Regions:
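Alpha-helical transmembrane segments of integral membrane proteins
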Residues: 106-139, 155, 184-338
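Cytoplasmic-entry segments and transmembrane alpha-helices of multi-pass inner-membrane transporters
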Residues: 8-15, 126-162, 252
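Membrane-water interface segments at transmembrane-helix boundaries in multipass membrane proteins
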Residues: 145-207
């Protein structure tokens, strides 16, 4: 039996790995062809104004130097081969290896997105539980109304309001950048620069997931076993936290796995508004200047993150939920009998 179970697990995870690899392959083809066939002249990004003065022969030589004069299928095969060796090409705009360019920016995005995700995850859970506990009472109504209003306000507009209030009028928070000039190592200065972008990232996603956890808890609260337990006089707090909240956590964890790329993607707009030197601003620049190598690697990183998180979420649903179902059935019978 153990051998059969191990074989089933190997087959199961093997299928997941195969799905991941096929998805990444399709993504790579789509990203490469869309980037290469997009309108624009990449030579302008690399050579600047000199491009206009080039003769046809010089343009041909320049295209050959950048590997852009070969058939697109040949370019794709070479790009994949180089990628397996960790070589993703040179940035046309920055004249550096694209890995080095991204490495200099990705830390800022991970800090902004990572801290934002943790705060949003914890805050949404607490707000969802609070709203479910005070269902249809004043606290629930106020929080739901505030959440609805907050969710309807565009990120960029909210960011501009914060800049106007706290930077222009009150002058207590910096309006742009990740740190002040010469203060790269000052943690306090970095925290001040992080406050407004972080606020926007959290507020943009917090209420959506708070509503979700509220509704899932209320679904559990209205389950037959909970109603019967209430009739038998079991403590409301014990029912809420030991059974209802616990039973919705697997579904919430799978949702949060999908939320990872969603939250990190939300930092792109925030970075542009606050001139925050992260991956979002870099993605915009790479698209604007037709920096193919940089743009393709950024798109691949984002796409792989989305694929990976979706597979993790699906795996959580398929692996945890069945076990939790058995556990829930046992708990329900204990609650009803007790």
């Amino acid at each position: 039996d153990r051998y059969i179970m191990r074989q089933k697990k190997l087959v199961y995870y093997g299928k997941k790995c195969l799905i991941f690899l096929i998805s990444v392959f399709i993504l790579s083809v789509a990203v490469f062809y869309v980037a290469r066939l997009a309108p624009g002249d990449p030579l302008i990004s690399y050579y600047g104004d000199r491009t206009e003065k080039m003769s046809p022969e010089e343009r041909e030589w320049a295209m050959g130097k950048l590997g852009l004069n070969e058939p697109i299928s040949v370019q794709y095969v070479k790009w994949v081969k180089n990628a397996f060796h960790g070589e993703f090409g040179i940035s046309f705009k920055y004249k550096q290896d694209v890995v080095e360019v991204i490495g200099g920016r990705i830390g800022n995005t991970l800090v902004l997105g990572g801290i934002g995700f943790i705060i949003m995850f914890a805050g949404a859970l607490l707000l969802g539980i609070l709203c479910a506990w005070y269902e249809n009472r004043l606290a629930d109504r106020i929080l739901c109304k505030l959440g609805t209003i907050s969710s309807c306000i565009p990120e960029f507009w909210m960011a501009l309001v914060l800049i106007l209030v706290f930077s222009v009028n009150l002058k207590i928070l910096p309006s742009s950048g990740a740190y002040s000039t010469g203060n790269a190592g000052d943690i306090g200065d970095r925290v001040l620069h992080l406050i407004m972008p972080l606020t926007i990232v959290v507020m943009e996603h917090l209420w959506y997931y708070a509503y979700m956890i509220r509704n899932k808890i209320l679904e559990e609260v209205r389950a037959d076993y909970v109603l019967l337990a209430k009739a038998k006089g079991l403590d409301k707090k014990k029912l809420m936290f030991r059974h209802c909240v616990r039973n919705v956590m697997p579904a919430y964890l799978s949702i949060m796995a999908i939320a990872v790329p969603h939250v990190l993607g939300g930092t792109y707009v925030v970075e542009s508004v606050f001139s925050y030197p992260g991956i979002g601003a870099l993605s915009y620049e790479s698209a604007r200047y037709h920096d193919y190598n940089l743009l393709m690697l950024l798109c691949m990183m984002s796409g792989i993150l989305v694929i990976f998180c979706n597979i993790v979420s699906q795996t959580i649903n398929e692996q945890i939920d069945p076990r939790m179902k058995d556990e829930v059935i046992t708990e329900k019978s204990e609650v009803v009998e007790g």
